[in-house]
């Protein structure tokens, strides 16, 4: 199973093609729209969110509410395209006829963004040729793919949820004593998608302060997946390890700078006796762990405990009090360019990381249990659970 996305931030639309879903997966388009709306929400978002009202359109692969087994093509329109038709026109253009369009040319790269490296690599004179695709607007297409993946995982009893653990210097307390439903309920009631109400209020204050200063904020999101059977992934080769795939996928999200699974870097500072999860067995549960410091992964495979993964996101590169840069055509020092942007996109990043994680899990479920139809995959899944129960 894989997906591709296409589209620029201010182009006509974003397109996602998902290949490898079996036939017969029930699809709720309203659920995809809800995830798209969740991505657009969150305290600290910018003016673009007032323009876009993301809704998914199906171009292929779904009929009468179920997948066909053929590639699924999804489209999300960019409503802001109407304001950018000349700037983003695919037709040859000698000169802009609209003076406002000429002002959209970008020649001052932003520190922390793809602008300069992309211009050098692809030999672009206008940084817009880089920033349009590098923009996090592309993640709407990834959320559509991941939301579809969550619907594939649901019949297997697998659930995935993302929420915010920190923004700037404010860290939330771990959501102890709450099941996944309780965590989700608290997080979705928070303006910053944080299940800790006290920390949530302080995060809002930090975002307000950064906005006043013309600055931006990053943070850490946590994704939990429940209901995973042991044995997804493999220890046999590097590219079959689930933790490796998750790390690659999550680090590919715009502004992601670090990933840890379970106790992660904290475990590196402790002794083995304080890190590794002791194993137990009972007739009703089978094998289990007394703790979950490994975050549900050992040797590149799920071990039956909840998957817990955290992703660190740097502050957004666009600053309204810009840092030093240079004009790429003259090499003269100048303030970095400014694009319409968010102050903090960490609440949105929680949704994106949730959906990216869901797609990777769906990929490994499909690889493990196969099946050209959902029913065939579920039969294989049930057979595997019966095999495990006999151990």
Swiss-Prot record:
Keywords: Amino-acid biosynthesis, Aromatic amino acid biosynthesis, FAD, Flavoprotein, FMN, Lyase, NADP. It catalyses: 5-O-(1-carboxyvinyl)-3-phosphoshikimate = chorismate + phosphate. GO terms for molecular function: chorismate synthase activity; FMN binding. FMN binds at residues 133-135, 254-255, 299, 314-318, 340. Reduced FMN (FMNH(2)). GO terms for cellular component: cytosol. Pathway: Metabolic intermediate biosynthesis; chorismate biosynthesis; chorismate from D-erythrose 4-phosphate and phosphoenolpyruvate: step 7/7. Transmembrane segments: none annotated. NADP(+) binds at residues 39, 45. GO terms for biological process: amino acid biosynthetic process; aromatic amino acid family biosynthetic process; chorismate biosynthetic process. It is an enzyme of class 4 (lyase). Its EC number is 4.2.3.5. NCBIfam families: aroC, PRK05382.1. This reaction introduces a second double bond into the aromatic ring system. HAMAP family: Chorismate_synth (MF_00300). Homotetramer. This is Chorismate synthase.
């Amino acid at each position: 199973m894989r997906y591709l996305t296409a589209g620029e931030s201010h182009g006509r639309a974003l397109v996602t093609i998902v290949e490898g879903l079996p036939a017969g997966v029930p699809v709720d388009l309203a659920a995809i729209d809800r995830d798209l709306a969740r991505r657009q929400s969150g305290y600290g978002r910018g003016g673009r969110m007032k323009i876009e009202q993301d809704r998914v359109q199906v171009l292929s692969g779904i009929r009468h509410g179920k997948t066909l087994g053929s590639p699924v093509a999804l489209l999300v329109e960019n409503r802001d395209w109407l304001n950018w038709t000349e700037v983003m026109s695919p037709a040859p253009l000698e000169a802009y006829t609209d003076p406002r369009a000429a002002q959209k040319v970008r020649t001052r790269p932003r520190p922390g963004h793809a602008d300069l490296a992309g211009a050098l690599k692809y030999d672009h004179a206008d940084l817009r040729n880089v920033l349009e695709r590098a923009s996090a607007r592309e993640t709407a297409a990834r959320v559509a793919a991941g939301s579809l993946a969550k619907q594939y995982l649901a019949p297997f009893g697998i659930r995935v949820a993302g929420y915010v653990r920190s923004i700037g210097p404010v860290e939330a307390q771990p959501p102890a004593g709450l099941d996944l439903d309780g965590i989700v309920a608290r997080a979705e009631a928070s303006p910053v998608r944080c299940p800790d109400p006290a920390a949530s209020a302080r995060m809002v204050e930090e975002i307000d302060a950064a906005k006043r200063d013309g600055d931006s904020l990053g943070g850490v999101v946590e994704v939990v997946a429940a209901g995973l059977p042991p044995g997804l992934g493999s220890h046999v080769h590097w590219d079959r390890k689930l933790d490796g795939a998750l790390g690659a996928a999550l680090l590919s999200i715009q502004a992601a700078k670090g990933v840890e699974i379970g106790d992660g870097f904290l475990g590196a500072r402790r002794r083995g006796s304080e890190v590794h999860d002791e194993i137990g067995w009972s007739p009703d549960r089978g094998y289990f762990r007394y703790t979950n410091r490994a975050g549900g992964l050992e040797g590149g495979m799920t071990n039956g405990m909840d998957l817990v993964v955290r992703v660190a996101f740097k502050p957004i590169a666009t600053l309204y009090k810009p840092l030093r840069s240079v004009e790429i055509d003259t090499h003269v020092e100048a303030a970095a360019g400014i694009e319409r942007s968010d102050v903090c996109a960490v609440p949105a990043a929680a949704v994106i990381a949730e959906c990216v994680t869901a797609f990777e899990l769906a990929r490994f479920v499909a690889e493990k249990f196969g099946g050209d139809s959902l029913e065939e995959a579920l039969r294989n899944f049930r057979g595997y659970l019966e095999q495990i129960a006999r151990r």
